[in-house]
Amino acid sequence: MDGRDWLYCDYVHSVINNKNCLVDMKKAEIKLNVTLDEQNIPESIDWSSTDGETTDQMPAKAMFLALWDAQYKNSLRIDLWTKDMPYDEMKRFFYETLQTLGDTFQRASGGDEMAEKVIGDLRDYCAHFAEKMEVLEEGA
């Protein structure tokens, strides 16, 4: 199966290449807890996962959550950062997020030639962004 084949599962039934099959699917849960101040600005963000190295709550200073709404064919997004997220860390967070979006798209494209070219353009932009925003340390 290449990256363009879609796997849809509801944790009991799967549809693979439009064929129904019964499989025993593993289930994992990701929990997000956001503490807000009086103006609804995040004070803290904590997350945990039942499928990680630890199930303990882990702190985070920022998060970007994107979901695809298949019914309406659009993205649903939640972008949050805490009051104490330093600007330099936010620049690095954006840079790393852009880089990993390219990695994800590359895996999803299944080696599509046009996608590879576009990913190359994204990598070039990431390098430009890092330089202009002084994200990377010298020699890194």
What are these regions (language model features)?
Residues 43-109:
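Active-site- and interface-proximal helix/loop "cap" or "latch" segments in soluble metabolic
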Residues 102-140:
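C-terminal charged interaction modules
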Residues 11-15, 19-57:
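Short, charged/polar N-terminal "headpieces" of proteins
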Residues 9-14, 18-19, 88, 94, ...:
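Compositionally biased, intrinsically disordered low-complexity regions enriched in proline and serine
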Residues 40, 86-91, 124-129:
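Short amphipathic alpha-helical patches
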